[in-house]
Amino acid sequence: MASIDELVEEIGKLTLTEASELVKALEEKFGVSAAPVMVAGGAMPGAAGAAEAPAEEKTEFDVVLKSAGASKINVIKVVRAATGLGLKEAKAVVDEAPSTVKEAMPKADAEKLVKELKEAGAEAEMK
């Protein structure tokens, strides 16, 4: 068990970029995806009542950088300003496009960030 605890500690020390690279490497090595698995509504007890309720409007959005475009430097500046990442980490996010720039943002903030990225020459979207 000590080796597992040590591994968890080492993973906890990774930067966001390094953690992203680790996830990609594990996905490739083991042929899996880190995407959440969708559960069929009928499989869970009590899901029938939840299925009848009207769909809730989404309140939190992820901003995804699809491509940096021609003016990569301007896009890196916008990513740094929005995320607080250092130059190296922001550059890695831009270089690894398509990548998530920021997660769980309110709709207005996400729209503003997408607009700023597009003005900088990037291709971005809200999910």
From Swiss-Prot:
Keywords: Ribonucleoprotein, Ribosomal protein. One of its GO terms (cellular component) is cytosolic large ribosomal subunit. One of its GO terms (molecular function) is structural constituent of ribosome. Pfam families: Ribosomal_L12, Ribosomal_L12_N. It comes from the Bacteria. GO terms for biological process: translation. Disulfide bonds: none annotated. Forms part of the ribosomal stalk which helps the ribosome interact with GTP-bound translation factors. Is thus essential for accurate translation. Homodimer. Part of the ribosomal stalk of the 50S ribosomal subunit. Forms a multimeric L10(L12)X complex, where L10 forms an elongated spine to which 2 to 4 L12 dimers bind in a sequential fashion. Binds GTP-bound translation factors. Belongs to the bacterial ribosomal protein bL12 family. This is Large ribosomal subunit protein bL12. It comes from Chloroherpeton thalassium (strain ATCC 35110 / GB-78).
